[in-house]
Amino acid sequence: MRVTVFGIGYVGLVQAAVLAEMGHKVACVDVDADKVAGLKEGRIPLFEPGLAPLVQRNHQAGRLIFTTDPARAVEFAELIFIAVGTPPDEDGSADLHQVMTVADTIGRLMQGGKVVVNKSTVPVGTASRVRRHIAERLADRGLDLPLDVVSNPEFLKEGAAVADCLRPDRIIIGTDSDHAFSLLEELYAPFNRKRDRILRMDARSAELTKYAANAMLATRISFINEMATLAEALGADIEEVRKGIGADPRIGHHFIYPGCGYGGSCFPKDVRALIHTAKEAGCETPLLRSVEQVNEAQKHRLMTRLHHHFGASLSGRTFALWGLAFKPNTDDMREAPSRVLMEAIWAAGGKVQAFDPEAMTEATRLYGQRADLTLCDTQETALQGADALLVCTEWQQFRAPDFDLLRQTLKQAIIFDGRNLYDPARLRQRGFTYYAIGRGDSLAHQEER
């Protein structure tokens, strides 16, 4: 099948590469000429495990092409995917400028019937809006061509996107058109062999499903973080509580790990967009507002601990920071807790020596050169001369460090752990002062000192 994907960012590039791997002919179109040129030369513009060889292999095989020519891409395709960004507007709503620009392009250029598939995360009603817009452009040209617009939301996890795309747990196809559904059913047949993963519904329900799924996961994170705050106040250990409630099969262990807050390109944006959508529909969403409020407060928890230990001013203090990306196995720093923490440290007069296995280039892009930030080549280098270690991201290589080296290298044997990676009792035996999230034992012992 011939497929065009508009947008070669995180969602579009993964989708295109996986479809090409299944044997489809895929054209990727983007307005960024440098990005297109880089992909033609084998340079991948983002870090995602397994993506680079997938892109390079299928490009070399001729199944995956990259272009800045939208006319060529529209003419090429039976199916056209829209996979462009929908960044948050100032009021929290999703900015649909890029989506509607693609719709305008399709309407101006299509010469025959098309099925347009929206992969971008968009508000309810966007499929209808895109269809109307394309139809208007066709009418301007005096054309009335067959057209279907389908909602086909993505459910990829950054850091596991290729695996999620190759082995989806569900494929939602939102359309009332039997023709469009049949085409997508054929497209996704290689992913649907062992069991039927396809869920057909109307487009509006498909659009809401995407937002509801992310809001549900964000709610679980904020819930466990609120319980962590209570555990601290009561002298309980949230890690034991987590195991206890997770053992209930109705709850399970997914997304109940306490920490210094969620970030990334999806959860913060989508919760706000859903709140905005509900407001426009005249619905109150006190639960969703609380989810967002708890998360924003959680991102400041480590800073509160720093002030508790070192005082209001951090002037003359330097902190080692492990983990800049919002989660492991990605270089994405969008709304990452590390950014909130670093910026608060700088505002209090402190300095940061940071290390992340993948996000150093992104940190340089965001912050440039500044005297209060040193980006280090290794996690050990970041420790040198630091007053304490701060952990913001649970990369595997941070889970079992050389604690003897750590204690010898830091000025003071202090760890502020935003991901609960370490055992408080063992660290105490090694002579560390240890602050974690929701581990009342770790805090109680510091207060006794």
Question: Residue ranges of each PLM-predicted region?
Answer:
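Structural/interface elements that position substrates and couple domains in central-metabolism enzymes
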Residues: 1-449
